[in-house]
Amino acid sequence: MMQKIEHIGIAVKSLATSIPLYESLLQTSCYKTETVASEFVNTAFFKVGDSKIELLESTTPDGVIAKFIEKKGEGIHHIAYEVDDIYQEMNRL
């Protein structure tokens, strides 16, 4: 069963310009940044109530996030749900 939205992933061209923008829009500070080398992204996280916003910046021009932005522009890339049993939810969907 889906419990809540765990986080919303937003593809951005630049964390350097997007972090201050989202801090202003969300009225909260970025609490964590990290590089996920296996996914070719840098990420930044913001807490919003019981959920999070994750900004994703590509580290390579041919990465998934870079291709997403090239095709669709910056914006919502994914919504992650917290679930009791991932396999049960996959089968249900």
Language-model-detected regions and their locations in the chain:
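A short, polar/proline- and glycine-enriched secondary-structure boundary/capping micro-motif
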Residues: L25, V64-F68
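Core segments of cupin and vicinal oxygen chelate
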Residues: M2, I10-K52, T59, Q88-N91
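Short, recurring structural edge motifs at helix starts
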Residues: G9-I10, A66
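Short, contiguous strand/loop micro-motifs
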Residues: I5-E6, C30, I76-H77
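Conserved secondary-structure micro-motifs at functional edges
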Residues: L55-G63, K71-G73
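Short aromatic/hydrophobic contact patches that present stacked aromatics
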Residues: H7-G9, F45, H78-A80
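Mid-chain, well-packed structural core segment of small domains
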Residues: F68-L93
